[in-house]
Amino acid sequence: LGKTDTIHAVCILKGSVHFFSDLMLNIRKLNVKYSFIHVSSYQGTSSTGRIRVKSWIDESIHDEYVLLVEDIVDTGLTLQYIVRYLKKYNPRDFRIVSLIEKTVHDHGVPLDFVGFRVDDKFLVGYGLDIDEKYRNLPYIGYVE
């Protein structure tokens, strides 16, 4: 990746939005363009096992350096779905960064960058939510 190359950063909405924003503000020496994917697989504190695609990227990622930005990897179901479909577009390079990885599951998705790893707690804040609540907390906490 050279100084003239561009990273195509793809944010998985809604949970990743705060992490994505902070990350993008700190990538200063490279050109970056943004795309957004809006998917959901949770209801309350449980995975439904079904992926609901609400919106998909609207720009080509063919032959581009793609950085997929995720908030938390738990079961990996949502991430597996997204990765499988994005790789069909044949990006030049494909990397995944997740703010949080839960260590309890073998999700089967190799992550290139991880902020931190946690036990199996339901987290809220900094974009993470329960039924759309607590996303706006400026910190990450867990629910008992």
Where are these regions (language model features)?
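PRPP-associated nucleotide enzymes
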Residues: 1-144
